Amino acid sequence: SEVELAYRTGKGEVLAITGTNGKTTTTALLGKIMGDARESVFVVGNIGTAYTSKSLEMREDSVTVAEISSFQLETIDQFRPKVSAILNITEDHLNRHHTMEEYIRVKELITKNQGPEDVCVLNYEDEVLRKFGENIVPKVVYFSSLRKLDQGIYLDGDQIILKTEKEEIPIVKTGEL
């Protein structure tokens, strides 16, 4: 597959985003944030730039932010993002996947090759994803815009907060995004 070929020929760390809705916006925003912080950043995938068109330009210090669709996840073999994110899963593409269970299974493949040192970011408000996060290998970081989390990323008024076991870290105000 295109994603698999690009992953095998590319270098650096991969941040991969999937979900039914919000993939393009999240990928673009994360690409901008990473581009402001790092020198070698590639924003690829379903967002419009083919992953393979940039993979040979990637260096060991590169960061690739990839929007990955369910269609692309169907054929991964070794693809292993350092950070994966599943934003949400709602009924979609059932003409291809036939059942909601199959669609969910394919979306969850984004974590297939992740190890315990990798991270998967999941939407706490999505019951399917909350349950999925209980039984996966990578570290799970939940996010929510509706409630404060004991650990994870949440919205408190207009402030985005990262709460760890030890501290609460203000990340950015929504008006600054």
Enumerate the language-model features and the residues they cover.
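Hydrophobic anchor at the start of a short beta-strand
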Residues: V14, E39-V41, P138-V140
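Short, well-ordered alpha-helices that flank and scaffold nucleotide-derived cofactor binding pockets
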Residues: G31-D36, S53-E57, E134
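A conserved segment at the C-terminal end of the G1
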Residues: T25-F42
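Short, basic phosphate-binding NTP loop
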Residues: S1-A16
